[in-house]
């Protein structure tokens, strides 16, 4: 006999469905479920007296006959392509489908088969997102990786060799020997990793050898001398080997101004770090490059969003990170030239317009590794409060804005760095790097972080308790973070050139090396999803006032933020 459930009762049992709305943490962002893949009355749920039992929601199919390894049931998916409710199937560490799970022997419309060998993760009332990608990493200490994983990041790309002076300031792993050792160290972590070589050179030989050694990108940094000659040389080498170039431009304008740097690009594709400029770059107008078709711009999280405390914390941060001495007037002037409230305020709005395309951390080098996701949603919330709904959000929800902002730390860095075939979104065929959230803690503290199909990090109670939930409940590494599981569920990104030179055979590594691809000529800002706007940006050199297509971009600093102290009492 059919039974009609009231919406609250249905949501309590199976999670929200089409037309229901969910608040994200304590923000003013509300999503609405656009589609539910289930068949009402055929929902699957695990537990005593529930559906997923032998002969009911669980069939007899073996893995060889098509059963999934894992099914995440009834999850609300937030991704760049939409906001839906569905079951998600995982197999051999990858996503095999998004749809309706169950037993096709007795249920109609089954896309994903539950068999005796299928594990279940309950997604009812929870939100599922793709694992985050932080593309601005200073590999200063290995402990960063657990911190990133705990926040919901599953891919880290950058450079460094540990707490060396060069690494404190620049995201470079310089030279073949260092690159090889860092790739070998990757086996010890449940995290996709990629390493950038040093790109500052005026001759190509020193750059090519780093690519052959395994660098998946090259980084141009002003502390090593980002001159027009170095920019031109680095981009030429990158074009030859299909890798991305990241740039931190010349704050002091010693070797040229922003216009000279743009000329050195010669229209070639480049990833511009901390494009606002507080993290470094031509003062005061580096942000002009965010309007160019060949520049893929990102932010780092200390300036995200603009608050009453942003300016004060930046000066000391900058002095430490760039090996400056506050007693030297020139060093102090260098630091102060980079910190401008006008451009930081404009950065908020350019993100909301989709003109700044990515978020990242700048880990321990003017950025916080564990706060990329939180700062992204704080920025989105601040813009909702100050600017109101986006024009695209006409249905009394924030779906478009939410899709725009999630793309900034998932699919867009994956596209930029040539790995979107493997990661960056919840789509069939991609690595099962997934994060499950309780809506009240969305963007702050994940329930589960799934790495390559295996739970690698989770909120967990007292291990000596009789049940999993007694206090203290906090994030802890799970089995996916140990032993050989780490190498079987994570990737190291490198170059096609390195693999052609036998890198896998040369190094003592167990995990798979995957080449980056499609990072050059055909990759333009319009390739970046929901974040490809290219306004004409002007910055007054005297007042620092920012205009986009003639409109002054300014907003007030926030005095308080969501996703902050109420979530971090201990």
From Swiss-Prot:
It comes from the Bacteria. The modification N6-carboxylysine is found at residue 219. One of its GO terms (cellular component) is cytoplasm. It is found in: Cytoplasm. It catalyses: urea + 2 H2O + H(+) = hydrogencarbonate + 2 NH4(+). Its cofactor is Ni cation. GO terms for molecular function: nickel cation binding; urease activity. Its EC number is 3.5.1.5. Substrate binds at residue 221. Carboxylation allows a single lysine to coordinate two nickel ions. Ni(2+) 2 binds at residues 219, 248, 274. Pathway: Nitrogen metabolism; urea degradation; CO(2) and NH(3) from urea (urease route): step 1/1. Keywords: Cytoplasm, Hydrolase, Metal-binding, Nickel. Ni(2+) 1 binds at residues 136, 138, 219, 362. The keyword Cell division does not apply. SUPFAM superfamilies: Composite domain of metallo-dependent hydrolases (SSF51338), Metallo-dependent hydrolases (SSF51556). Residues 131-570 form the Urease domain. One of its GO terms (biological process) is urea catabolic process. The active site is at 322 (proton donor). Pfam families: Amidohydro_1, Urease_alpha. Gene3D superfamilies: Metal-dependent hydrolases, Urease, subunit C, domain 1. HAMAP family: Urease_alpha (MF_01953). Heterotrimer of UreA (gamma), UreB (beta) and UreC (alpha) subunits. Three heterotrimers associate to form the active enzyme. Belongs to the metallo-dependent hydrolases superfamily. Urease alpha subunit family. This is Urease subunit alpha. It comes from Beijerinckia indica subsp. indica (strain ATCC 9039 / DSM 1715 / NCIMB 8712).
């Amino acid at each position: 006999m059919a039974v009609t459930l009231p919406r609250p009762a249905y949501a309590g049992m199976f999670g929200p469905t089409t037309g229901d709305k969910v608040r994200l943490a304590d923000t003013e962002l509300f999503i609405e479920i656009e589609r539910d893949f289930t068949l009402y009355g055929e929902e699957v749920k695990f537990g005593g007296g529930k559906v997923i039992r032998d002969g009911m929601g669980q069939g007899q199919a073996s893995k060889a006959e098509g059963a999934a390894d894992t099914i995440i049931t009834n999850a609300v998916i937030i991704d760049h392509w939409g906001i839906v409710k569905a079951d998600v199937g995982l197999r051999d560490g990858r996503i095999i489908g998004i749809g309706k799970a169950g037993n096709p022997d007795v249920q109609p419309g089954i896309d994903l088969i539950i068999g005796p060998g299928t594990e279940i993760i309950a997604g009812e009332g929870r939100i599922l997102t793709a694992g985050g990608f932080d593309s601005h990493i200073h590999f200063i200490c290995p402990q960063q990786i657990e911190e990133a994983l705990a926040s919901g990041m599953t891919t880290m790309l950058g450079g460094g060799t540990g707490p060396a002076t060069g690494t404190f300031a620049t995201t470079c792993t310089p030279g073949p020997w260092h690159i090889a050792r860092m790739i070998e160290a990757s086996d010890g972590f449940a995290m996709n990793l990629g390493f950038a070589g040093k790109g500052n050179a005026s001759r190509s030989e020193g750059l090519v050898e780093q690519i052959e050694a395994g660098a998946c990108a090259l980084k141009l940094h002003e502390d090593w001398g980002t001159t027009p000659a170095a920019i031109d040389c680095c981009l030429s080498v990158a074009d030859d080997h299909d890798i991305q170039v990241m740039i931190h431009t010349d704050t002091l304008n010693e070797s040229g101004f922003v216009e000279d740097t743009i000329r050195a690009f010669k229209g070639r594709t480049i990833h511009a770090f901390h494009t606002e400029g507080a993290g470094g770059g031509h003062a005061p107008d580096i942000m002009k490059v965010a309007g160019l078709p060949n520049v893929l711009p990102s932010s780092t999280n200390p300036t995200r969003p603009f608050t009453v405390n942003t300016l004060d914390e930046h000066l000391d941060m900058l002095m430490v990170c760039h090996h400056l001495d506050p007693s030297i007037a020139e060093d102090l002037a260098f630091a102060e030239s980079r910190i401008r409230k006008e451009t930081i305020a404009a950065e908020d709005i350019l993100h909301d317009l989709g003109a700044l395309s990515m978020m990242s951390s700048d880990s321990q080098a003017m950025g916080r590794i564990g706060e990329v996701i939180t700062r992204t949603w704080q920025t989105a919330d601040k813009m909702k409060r100050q600017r109101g709904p986006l024009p695209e959000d006409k249905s009394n929800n924030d779906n478009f804005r939410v899709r725009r902002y999630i793309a900034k730390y998932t699919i867009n860095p994956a596209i930029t760095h040539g790995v979107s075939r493997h990661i960056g979104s919840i789509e069939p065929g991609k690595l099962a790097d997934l994060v499950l959230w309780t809506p009240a803690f969305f963007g702050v503290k994940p329930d589960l972080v799934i790495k390559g199909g295996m739970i690698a990090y989770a909120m967990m109670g007292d291990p000596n308790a009789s049940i999993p939930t007694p206090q203290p409940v906090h994030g802890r590494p799970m089995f996916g973070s140990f032993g050989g599981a780490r190498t079987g569920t994570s990737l190291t990104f490198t170059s096609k050139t390195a693999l052609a030179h036998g890198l896998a055979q040369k190094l003592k590594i167990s995990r798979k090396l995957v080449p980056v691809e499609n990072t050059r000529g055909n990759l333009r800002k319009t390739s970046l999803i929901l974040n490809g706007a290219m306004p004409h940006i002007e910055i007054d050199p005297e007042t620092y006032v920012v205009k986009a297509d003639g409109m002054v971009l300014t907003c007030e600093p926030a005095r308080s933020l969501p996703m902050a102290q109420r979530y971090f009492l201990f």
